From Swiss-Prot:
Family named by the database record: Belongs to the ELP4 family.
Annotated GO CC locations: cytoplasm; elongator holoenzyme complex; transcription elongation factor complex
Function comment: Component of the elongator complex which is required for multiple tRNA modifications, including mcm5U (5-methoxycarbonylmethyl uridine), mcm5s2U (5-methoxycarbonylmethyl-2-thiouridine), and ncm5U (5-carbamoylmethyl uridine). The elongator complex catalyzes the formation of carboxymethyluridine in the wobble base at position 34 in tRNAs.
GO biological process, one term: regulation of transcription by RNA polymerase II
Cellular compartment(s): Cytoplasm; Nucleus
Top-level taxon of the source organism: Eukaryota
Tagged with keyword Nucleus: yes
Pathway(s) per entry: tRNA modification; 5-methoxycarbonylmethyl-2-thiouridine-tRNA biosynthesis
Name of this chain's protein: Elongator complex protein 4
Keywords annotated in UniProt: Cytoplasm, Nucleus, tRNA processing
Length: 333
């Protein structure tokens, strides 16, 4: 939260209720959060039974930061991120591409569209979309040179990672919070920590201490942190530590084979989007989405989209207030 008298202007950020906010790169995700990501917050992404869908949110997060000139930092001890995720960061769509979608292909197309009766004109239409339709990034085209800092150590350790993060935050005081006006120019730091739940860290038993220090570091800096993990492969007590450290907690649970057959009407949806918790950095009350029955779709064509889950009507069941007549009602005495 900004102190009284503070004046910070960072590209890609806005101030709301004395809180600095930034976009995640996914419009539907921002809408669920109340408009944007809150500065100094930690977002926990639980890839339950999967390791492929959370990368869409991470790539949008990094692409948005690179677009506005934010500093980005990625740490993943299990793989070389320079050869994986950094090679598939999407490019931002041009404004001309969105305008082409709105222009009809033929002059008479707009007149030939179907129209509903006038008495239904003011009836609210049911839609599954959350927030603005479409996506700002093209996942089929990738950035050639992504300026992202990478955590690279032969023996990964939480103590070494925290030391590097402190050096990044304090370098030239670009990401440290300061009171009053003046001082060095500030910038936002976007951090992505992947697979910190794996038992390949040298000081894995110090995960709880690392999370406490990380939370304190985030509160005192202009930074937003993404943590990507898998609760399905973690002990319950270890996962509780991650949940306690996170301000925003979401879970991506893909459909199993039976659910894919059951939910064919959902089209290309890939799984459930569970919203576990929202940030409470300013008050005990927080933004509450109007509905929590959500699904997600992740593809290179549409990117990552969150939709409302609409169940098909049950045609076999009688309508409300109507019941089938029983045989006893036709008996004459």
């Amino acid at each position: 939260m900004l102190n009284i008298g503070d004046s910070v202007q960072i590209p890609g950020c806005s101030t709301k209720k004395r809180l600095l906010e930034t976009t995640s790169g996914c419009d539907s995700f921002d809408t669920l959060l109340g408009g944007a990501l809150v500065n100094s917050s930690i977002v926990l992404i639980d890839e339950y039974r999967s390791r492929c869908y959370g990368s869409y949110l991470v790539r949008s997060f990094l692409a948005e930061g690179l677009h506005y000139g934010h500093r980005c930092f990625v740490a993943d001890p299990s793989e070389d991120v320079s050869e994986t995720i950094l090679k598939v960061i999407p490019t931002r769509k041009a404004a001309e591409d969105d305008q082409k979608k709105e222009i009809p292909s033929s002059p008479g197309q707009a007149d030939n569209d179907m129209k509903i009766a006038w008495r239904y004109g003011n009836v609210k239409q049911v839609t599954s979309e959350i927030g603005p339709s479409g996506n700002q990034y093209d996942f089929s085209k990738h950035l050639e040179n992504s300026n992202v800092d990478v955590y690279n150590e032969e023996i990964p350790s939480f103590s070494g990672l925290y030391k590097i993060l402190c050096e990044v935050v304090q370098k030239e005081e670009a990401h440290t919070k300061s009171t009053g006006r003046g001082g060095p120019k500030k910038n936002l730091l976007r951090v992505v920590l992947k697979n910190i739940h794996l038992n390949i860290w040298e000081d894995y038993e110090s995960l709880g201490r690392f999370l406490c220090c990380l939370r304190s570091l985030a509160r005192s800096s202009y930074a937003v942190i993404y943590i990507v993990a898998n609760s399905h492969r973690m002990p319950n007590d270890t996962w509780r530590q991650l949940e306690s450290a996170a301000d925003t907690h979401i879970q991506l649970m893909p459909f199993n084979e039976q659910e894919k057959k059951m939910f064919r009407h959902l089209g290309t949806a890939h799984g459930y989007f569970h919203l576990k918790s929202l940030p409470r950095l300013m008050s005990a009350g927080t933004h509450t989405p109007p509905i929590l029955d959500l699904i997600f779709e992740a593809s290179s064509k549409k990117g990552f989209q969150i939709r409302v889950m609409h169940l098909p009507p049950a045609f076999d069941e009688p309508a409300p207030g109507q019941q089938k007549a029983t045989a006893c009602q036709n008996i004459d005495f």
